[in-house]
């Protein structure tokens, strides 16, 4: 089971350089994908900020029903500060890390900062999938 990082979805939604490989990853993992509530909100913020509300609406209609949206348990929020201190990850990444750890998920990402937690959870980088 995979926690798909925000950057994978944004790469496709914003038609960026690696959109084709990211789309293949998303298509290949239908039914095994998890999206954090934080990622969903981040995608919305970025798309709205860039005047792409129509893309967000399409995403919510086409993609969101195919993924499981998960949130960090309330009692684990207190662990985010210690996890940040231990790993050096920023808030976005430490949230993804802790949610993946809680649910026993592998993170699929393009964010090299996740190298810092490879010894704690399974991380797969897009370039290793190609």
Residue ranges and their predicted role:
Residues 13-17, 47, 84, 118-121:
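Short, flexible helix/strand-to-coil boundary loops that buttress conserved ligand/catalytic motifs
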Residues 1, 66, 70, 101-130:
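Acidic, PIN/NYN-like endoribonuclease modules and their adjacent C-terminal/linker elements
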Residues 9, 40, 114-115:
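A generic structural signal for short hydrophobic patches within well-formed alpha-helices
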Residues 1-35, 48-58, 130:
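Short, well-structured N-terminal submotif of metal-dependent ribonuclease cores
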Residues 42-43, 79, 116-117:
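Phosphate- and divalent-cation-binding pockets in alpha/beta enzyme and binding domains
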